[in-house]
């Protein structure tokens, strides 16, 4: 099985990238979000790979992060969701947005993905509600780092998120509120200030 590809971009198509690895080109099907983050032909790229082996074909799916790949597999555990629909969902929602939609049972957010009707959206948010928390926490941590910088995992932010979850808010609600608080307070804010500002955000 192929777990990761490191090479150079040979070509980017509508739903795939052709990766040249030492003269051998691999076709990796990707979400629109992943394709948008890749460079141009000739540039280096690294993709986490999910390999599908069928009787008549071998198909590779590429992802920017291992977390996105895990969500790809988790989505397909839901009845009626195949690789195409899973990629459509990941093209529409980031892992953190998907975790948030599931936590809030937001069918409308999920149904924005092409090919996801009301029934499939309902199954996704319902069936994954109790199976997604582990993915949600990591997705939120990544989203915070991307939005606020690598230092956001430090004590004040972590303490503020923990305090808000202890008050009964979900982890994604708490993380989103603290992210907004960080933008208002700045990098030097202590946990008490982040909690106070976070509560104001949640009260809106």
Swiss-Prot record:
Localization per Swiss-Prot or TrEMBL: Cytoplasm
SUPFAM superfamilies: DNA helicase RuvA subunit, C-terminal domain, Nucleic acid-binding proteins, RuvA domain 2-like
Coiled-coil boundaries: none
Key words of the record: Cytoplasm, DNA damage, DNA recombination, DNA repair, DNA-binding
Pfam families named in the record: HHH_5 (PF14520), RuvA_C (PF07499), RuvA_N (PF01330)
GO BP terms, alphabetized: DNA recombination; DNA repair
Residue span of region Domain II: 65-143
Region (Domain III): 152-204
UniProt entry tagged with the keyword Secreted: no
Molecular function via GO: ATP binding; four-way junction DNA binding; four-way junction helicase activity
Region (Flexible linker): 144-151
Xref: InterPro entries: DNA_helicase_Holl-junc_RuvA_I, NA-bd_OB-fold, RuvA, RuvA_2-like, RuvA_C, RuvA_C_sf
Lyase recorded as keyword: no
GO CC annotation, single: cytoplasm
Domain comment (free text): Has three domains with a flexible linker between the domains II and III and assumes an 'L' shape. Domain III is highly mobile and contacts RuvB.
HAMAP family documented for this protein: DNA_HJ_migration_RuvA
NCBIfam families given in the database record: ruvA
Family: Belongs to the RuvA family.
Quaternary organization: Homotetramer. Forms an RuvA(8)-RuvB(12)-Holliday junction (HJ) complex. HJ DNA is sandwiched between 2 RuvA tetramers; dsDNA enters through RuvA and exits via RuvB. An RuvB hexamer assembles on each DNA strand where it exits the tetramer. Each RuvB hexamer is contacted by two RuvA subunits (via domain III) on 2 adjacent RuvB subunits; this complex drives branch migration. In the full resolvosome a probable DNA-RuvA(4)-RuvB(12)-RuvC(2) complex forms which resolves the HJ.
Protein role: The RuvA-RuvB-RuvC complex processes Holliday junction (HJ) DNA during genetic recombination and DNA repair, while the RuvA-RuvB complex plays an important role in the rescue of blocked DNA replication forks via replication fork reversal (RFR). RuvA specifically binds to HJ cruciform DNA, conferring on it an open structure. The RuvB hexamer acts as an ATP-dependent pump, pulling dsDNA into and through the RuvAB complex. HJ branch migration allows RuvC to scan DNA until it finds its consensus sequence, where it cleaves and resolves the cruciform DNA.
Protein name (Swiss-Prot/TrEMBL): Holliday junction branch migration complex subunit RuvA
Natural source organism: Rhizobium etli (strain CIAT 652)
